[in-house]
């Protein structure tokens, strides 16, 4: 058993270069100066770690968890009696409700828990047969690669190319090896055009790919990823998952990945770890566990409703099973809704960052009483547009009017009351010591914020420090804080990151309720399943311009990339499983 003290507030571990987050151990100049020179200047090679990623003498099992238990302080067990073996060349998916302990399980595997989190750990973790519980992190830094939920927190250099090379320099690899691996990784992840970009100018999805790439360059034996596709558009997510699959199948790298968007990862997984509460972990093949799992992708829920066996895990299998179902369901009646009065009017809005045009002469109107989804590839300008609408972000031209008022002309407090904004990095809005204090500051002690938080993610202790919450729990807290002010217009940037399916259904209901009160809601998201649940209208951005707009059923049906799973299986106008269930029930009662 190992007991570690918790880290000092504000000194969180940096996820990005191996289990310890210890990336500044090399002697000499600082990381930025070294990073700029390392690809152009020969230097002593130092210790070398040769060979392809994933390959080790003997192969076989890579990581083994034996009777693992973990708890924070005197709290209930987060993990209990966990046994898990990951073999070479295996992709294992970790799933479960928000706050069930997925990130903690990954932290135990990498050694971050309890070394950097505090808490009590029992049991043992073996890497290639050797215990890592009591060994220093530096001894496994090149063998376990880790990318956390906030990839930007691990960046220590200025540019993409420098960041990809930094970890290799700490391992003492020769410059020619570093150059080759950087080029291979840039091509592998499709980010060659970003090589010279400042990391601070990248979109969230671009940062995610750079963080993954910076780990891949070190050729780890085990790759541990916490929500790796949460900030990626559907196409980019497929590319990253295809890359991971190639590493698994061709190079024998083992991958352990925690993900809420099961529809993306389940088809690639060899096995699945399902955290079901009380610290218990169930391990098995995805098809077996998803039969009764409380968290399941839409395609599995559709299979349950239709009585298909075995349950489909991908769209191709579901389409084969669904032959005839679409005809039996018939069509949905088209409902003509009157155009609402615009709550937000935007004319020729432009945003420029340096030499990059992020938003290009955009015209749009957001109607009161409507939920509009803002979609597009990573880097298409969604976040820049949202910040410009709120009034805090820069504008290079154009006008924004919210009920006749330009938010940019208001004080910060005035803007927050008129236009609520949940940013992509929601934790930036948290600054107090406990969840209770954050809620009281948001609603003046009325209890409205806490009540909303309980609806989104039940059971978060009032005395918990916000920085100790999981990513999904922190997001839910920020959502409750912003929504408790009930602003006239609500803007949300990737609000479903870290949320399970149940929490997303609750969030969709909250947003629909706000829209029913006459508020305008704009949600920037890559989560096509959430769009199918909540949106009335969709705007699609490409290179800063609106390239498609209209009702959700028409826009998503036009785009294979943004279509939800039910639409891919049954075709338009079907978007959601609950629509299919309702129609089947109607037909059953009529027969």
Task: Give short role names for the model-derived ranges.
Residues 29-59, 287, 291-342, 562-591:
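ABC ATPase nucleotide-binding domains
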Residues 110, 390:
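Helix-to-loop junction immediately C-terminal to a conserved catalytic motif
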Residues 118-130, 398-406, 415:
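Conserved ABC transporter NBD signature motif
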Residues 177-194, 447-461:
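Conserved ABC ATPase "signature" region
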Residues 223-226, 490-493:
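Catalytic Walker B motif of ABC-type/P-loop ATPase nucleotide-binding domains
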Residues 259-260, 525-526:
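H-loop/switch region of ABC-family ATPase nucleotide-binding domains
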């Amino acid at each position: 058993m190992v007991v570690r003290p918790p880290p000092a507030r504000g000194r969180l571990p940096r996820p990005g270069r191996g289990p310890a987050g210890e990336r500044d151990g090399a002697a000499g100049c600082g990381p930025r100066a070294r990073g700029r020179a390392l690809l152009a200047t020969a230097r002593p090679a130092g210790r070398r770690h040769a060979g392809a990623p994933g390959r080790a003498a003997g192969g076989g099992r890579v990581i083994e968890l034996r009777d693992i238990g973990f708890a924070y302080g005197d709290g209930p067990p987060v993990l209990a009696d966990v046994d898990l073996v990951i073999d070479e060349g295996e992709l294992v998916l970790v799933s479960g409700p928000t706050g069930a302990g997925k990130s903690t399980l990954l932290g135990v595997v990498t050694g971050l828990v309890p070394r950097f989190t505090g808490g009590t750990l029992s049991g043992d973790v073996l890497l290639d047969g050797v215990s890592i519980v009591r060994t220093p992190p530096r001894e496994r830094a090149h063998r376990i690669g880790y990318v956390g939920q906030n990839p930007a927190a691990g960046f220590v250099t200025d540019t993409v190319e420098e960041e990809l090379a930094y970890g290799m320099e700490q391992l003492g690899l020769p410059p020619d090896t570093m150059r080759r691996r950087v080029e291979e990784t840039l091509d592998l992840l499709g980010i060659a055009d970003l090589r010279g970009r400042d990391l601070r100018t990248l979109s969230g999805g671009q940062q995610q790919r750079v963080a993954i790439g910076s780990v891949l360059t070190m050729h780890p034996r085990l790759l541990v990823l916490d929500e790796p596709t949460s900030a990626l558009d559907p196409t980019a997510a497929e590319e990253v998952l295809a890359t991971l699959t190639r590493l698994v199948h061709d190079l024998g790298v083992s991958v352990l990945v925690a993900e809420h968007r099961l529809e993306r990862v389940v088809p690639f997984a060899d096995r699945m770890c399902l955290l079901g509460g009380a610290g218990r972990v169930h391990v098995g093949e995805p098809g077996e566990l998803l039969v009764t799992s409380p968290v399941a992708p839409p395609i599995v829920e559709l299979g349950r409703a239709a009585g298909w066996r075995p349950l489909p895990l991908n769209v191709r299998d579901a389409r084969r099973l669904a032959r005839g179902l679409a005809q039996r369901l018939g069509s949905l009646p088209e409902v003509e809704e009157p155009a609402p009065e615009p709550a937000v009017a935007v004319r020729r809005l432009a945003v420029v960052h340096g030499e990059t045009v992020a938003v290009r002469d955009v015209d749009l109107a957001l109607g009161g009483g409507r939920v509009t989804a803002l979609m597009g590839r990573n880097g298409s300008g969604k976040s820049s547009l949202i910040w410009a609408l709120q009034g805090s972000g820069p504008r290079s031209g154009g006008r924004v009017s919210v009920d006749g008022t330009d938010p940019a002309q208001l004080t910060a407090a005035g803007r927050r009351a008129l236009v609520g904004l949940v940013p992509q990095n929601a934790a930036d809005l948290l600054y107090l010591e406990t969840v209770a204090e954050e809620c009281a500051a948001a609603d003046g002690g009325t209890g409205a914020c806490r009540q909303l938080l309980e609806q989104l993610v039940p059971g978060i202790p009032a005395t918990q420090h916000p920085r100790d919450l999981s990513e999904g729990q922190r997001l839910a807290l920020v959502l409750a804080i912003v929504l408790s002010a009930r602003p006239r217009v609500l803007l949300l940037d990737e609000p479903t990151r870290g949320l399970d399916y149940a929490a997303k259904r609750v969030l969709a209901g909250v947003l629909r309720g706000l829209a029913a009160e006459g508020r305008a809601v704009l949600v920037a998201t890559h989560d096509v399943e959430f769009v199918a649940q909540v949106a009335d209208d969709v705007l699609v951005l490409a290179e800063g311009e609106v390239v498609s707009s209209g009702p959700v059923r028409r826009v998503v049906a036009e785009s294979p990339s943004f279509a939800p799973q039910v639409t891919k299986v049954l075709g338009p106008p079907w978007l959601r499983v609950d629509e299919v269930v309702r129609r089947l029930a109607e037909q059953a009662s009529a027969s």
